[in-house]
From Swiss-Prot:
Disulfide bonds: none annotated. This is Large ribosomal subunit protein bL33A. InterPro entries: Ribosomal_bL33 (IPR001705), Ribosomal_bL33_CS (IPR018264), Ribosomal_bL33_sf (IPR038584), Ribosomal_zn-bd (IPR011332). Coiled coil: none annotated.
Amino acid sequence: MAQKRGTRLGCNDCNEINYITRKNAKKNPEKLSLNKYCSRCRGTTVHKEVKRK
């Protein structure tokens, strides 16, 4: 079987994709939103789930 693709988290301020994580889409259908460190902004910002192209 094919592996699951990771969920990408992008910074809300600068739109840079900094993190890749996994989530259970059946249990958590809404978009993931976490406070994470952004190296471009040099601080903690909200990172939201970004749609794959």
